[in-house]
């Protein structure tokens, strides 16, 4: 009986490790109102994969563009791998191609034509053995919108704390 429980726990741990978060852009949800998300693949070289798996990616200043019918990721810093020589390492800020279906790219292009919308990288995570990037279609928030969202978040937190006391 204990043996079966150990197998289930090991399987659950393996699933959690196969779907873990590698990098997160927490600032994006503060600066943008995310209207829609899309999970895409990302074209990487070997040293980039090793660095991302070690958690050495920074999405904060990143953005996505559609050029020549392809999704591209710009300004995302992936640190050079520590155990690779200078010759074999990658450029930390290079433009990376994102992998998505043509109809998804066309849909995003149509939505981006609206004023004030942008494609923002939200997080990098593992899905099985594949590294995936979640991008969000976001509308920039004004300062008063950010304040209102912060007040709403604070009030929800206070209500939850009050309920927990009783």
Swiss-Prot record:
Keyword entries, A-Z: Cytoplasm, RNA-binding
GO biological-process terms attached to the record: trans-translation
Origin superkingdom: Bacteria
Pfam families linked to this entry: SmpB
Gene3D superfamilies recorded: 2.40.280.10
Subcellular location, principal: cytoplasm
Assigned GO CC terms: cytosol
MF annotations from Gene Ontology: RNA binding
Entry coiled-coil feature ranges: none
Membrane-traversing stretches: none
Localization per Swiss-Prot or TrEMBL: Cytoplasm
InterPro entries, A to Z: SmpB (IPR023620), SsrA-bd_prot (IPR000037), SsrA-bd_prot_CS (IPR020081)
Function summary: Required for rescue of stalled ribosomes mediated by trans-translation. Binds to transfer-messenger RNA (tmRNA), required for stable association of tmRNA with ribosomes. tmRNA and SmpB together mimic tRNA shape, replacing the anticodon stem-loop with SmpB. tmRNA is encoded by the ssrA gene; the 2 termini fold to resemble tRNA(Ala) and it encodes a 'tag peptide', a short internal open reading frame. During trans-translation Ala-aminoacylated tmRNA acts like a tRNA, entering the A-site of stalled ribosomes, displacing the stalled mRNA.
Family: Belongs to the SmpB family.
Protein name as catalogued: SsrA-binding protein
Name of the gene this protein is made from: smpB
